[in-house]
Amino acid sequence: MGFLVSKGNLLLLLCASIFPAFGHVETRAHAEERLLKKLFSGYNKWSRPVANISDVVLVRFGLSIAQLIDVDEKNQMMTTNVWVKQEWHDYKLRWDPQEYENVTSIRIPSELIWRPDIVLYNNADGDFAVTHLTKAHLFYDGRIKWMPPAIYKSSCSIDVTFFPFDQQNCKMKFGSWTYDKAKIDLVSMHSHVDQLDYWESGEWVIINAVGNYNSKKYECCTEIYPDITYSFIIRRLPLFYTINLIIPCLLISCLTVLVFYLPSECGEKITLCISVLLSLTVFLLLITEIIPSTSLVIPLIGEYLLFTMIFVTLSIIITVFVLNVHHRSPRTHTMPDWVRRVFLDIVPRLLFMKRPSTVKDNCKKLIESMHKLTNSPRLWSETDMEPNFTTSSSPSPQSNEPSPTSSFCAHLEEPAKPMCKSPSGQYSMLHPEPPQVTCSSPKPSCHPLSDTQTTSISKGRSLSVQQMYSPNKTEEGSIRCRSRSIQYCYLQEDSSQTNGHSSASPASQRCHLNEEQPQHKPHQCKCKCRKGEAAGTPTQGSKSHSNKGEHLVLMSPALKLAVEGVHYIADHLRAEDADFSVKEDWKYVAMVIDRIFLWMFIIVCLLGTVGLFLPPWLAGMI
């Protein structure tokens, strides 16, 4: 029984301790309920919260940015996530905290109270006003704080002059849509936009964001309407565009410059130009999706791309002209004197170009050696002389002069006399071609050359005279003349001092055959002589002096054709050398033009690059 009494006392004590707490909570809730009933009984949310109709409702306005979502250059629109801060006083919503259990503030639905109709004037898309109506914080003195979040798409005039190094000034204009300045006036909470909770953007950085109070009279109305305009100065982060836009443009420009450094002989200049032009065209198709499509101003990068396009097009035109100059020849074009003077003399010195002359000198040396070889007295080897000739010299008893009937083969016994011999056994004496006559000798004999003549042999031009002789031991009653010639190359000296008298003149020489044959076989053979008189006419010493400059020539027609062929080859090489020289001059002119435009395009490319970066740098955007 005592246990039950003690247990009942404990329950009474517990209830006594709990009931005051519940009574306090119930009293607090009852106080707010009573407060709400008191505040909103007969409250009209459509009327301005002023005691006198002439009073002005002061609305303190502020803005806090949470995120810069996007800046659309094409649509010229800025999307932001902001908190709209608003404060005003409502005299109808006041109370004494002592009457309501010291309740100093309550949260009330914003739909139940009067709100200023503040909207975004420069709204581009979506709702002008706040759509998410959060609860307002009401204080006992009638002060109301309302901070609803909002995502605004405000129109922004995008200036893409220095794109991608641009800096934009986007504005957000807030004001009452229906109440003029006499009804509602705005007061800025802070001079700057609150960025304490700002989430940094990956493309834009906010340089500054300030708010300015303005009053404006619109054409539609006679009243003055106040507004607070926030200016967001934002700058683009150019790293993405530098890597994906500017550097490729610079590389394309460099490729265009390299076109003029490429030799014309490789044949890839036009291919490189067309490849650069096609790559730039494809690149421009991608750029149009990035660059703002506005006609108000041309972006700087657009100007640079247009400059590069013109750059590449001009390089193609110039390359075609350079290739045309490079492949010119004497058969198609004649090089004017001013071109030779300007592009072969003046401009290369200004460009510090030095033309190599090794190939041209080698060609000249080759042709000179060919001419020297054809005129050389030792063109043929001495060992190739025919051994079938025999000599018999019989000087005339009437005179010291060589007899016209002396054997021509006598001088063949002297191996030191001939200076040039052909492999075919042909001899020639080099001199200008005077008229030739043919004479006959009743006795086959050869007149030997005098010592003065043989020692004065030197270089000369080779001509052909045919020598006839009879073979050894032919059949009886028949004499056969065969064409056999051995080349002697010599020049007649102006004077001969051998034995104190003049040598025999070439005009007095007679060409005869001397062969071993039977005495009873007379024969007669015709030969060619140089300005000879009739056969058997003796030559005079004075005649010899009068014909000093003439030379005796003995050459066969075949040898003459061979020598003429060599001269033809030499002349052909000389003509080819002249053509080659003119072609090389045209090629050098093309190279000089290439070098001129190489330096010009390098300078223009550097100036264009500087023009791309200098204006933004001067404007303080880089």
From Swiss-Prot:
Keyword Disulfide bond part of the UniProt annotation: yes
Keywords, in A-Z order: Calcium, Cell membrane, Disulfide bond, Glycoprotein, Ion channel, Ion transport, Ligand-gated ion channel, Lipoprotein, Membrane, Metal-binding, Palmitate, Receptor, Signal, Synapse, Transmembrane, Transmembrane helix, Transport
Source species, domain of life: Eukaryota
Regions of compositional bias (Polar residues) in chain numbering: 450-472, 497-508
Catalytically driven reaction(s): Ca(2+)(in) = Ca(2+)(out); K(+)(in) = K(+)(out); Na(+)(in) = Na(+)(out)
Residues that coordinate or bind Ca(2+): V71, E73
Ranges of compositional bias, category Low complexity: 390-407
A family per Pfam: Neur_chan_LBD
SUPFAM superfamilies: Neurotransmitter-gated ion-channel transmembrane pore, Nicotinic receptor ligand binding domain-like
GO biological process terms on file: acetylcholine receptor signaling pathway; membrane depolarization; monoatomic ion transmembrane transport; neuromuscular synaptic transmission; response to nicotine; synaptic transmission, cholinergic
Segments for region (Disordered): 380-477, 497-516
Record's bilayer topology term: Multi-pass membrane protein
Assembly and oligomerization: Neuronal AChR is composed of two different types of subunits: alpha and beta. CHRNA4 forms heteropentameric neuronal acetylcholine receptors with CHRNB2 and CHRNB4, as well as CHRNA5 and CHRNB3 as accesory subunits. Found in two major stoichiometric forms, LS (low agonist sensitivity): (CHRNA4)3:(CHRNB2)2 and HS (high agonist sensitivity): (CHRNA4)2:(CHRNB2)3, the two stoichiometric forms differ in their unitary conductance, calcium permeability, ACh sensitivity and potentiation by divalent cation. Cells produce predominantly an (CHRNA4)3:(CHRNB2)2 nAChR.
Name the record gives this protein: Neuronal acetylcholine receptor subunit alpha-4
Native species: Gallus gallus (Chicken)
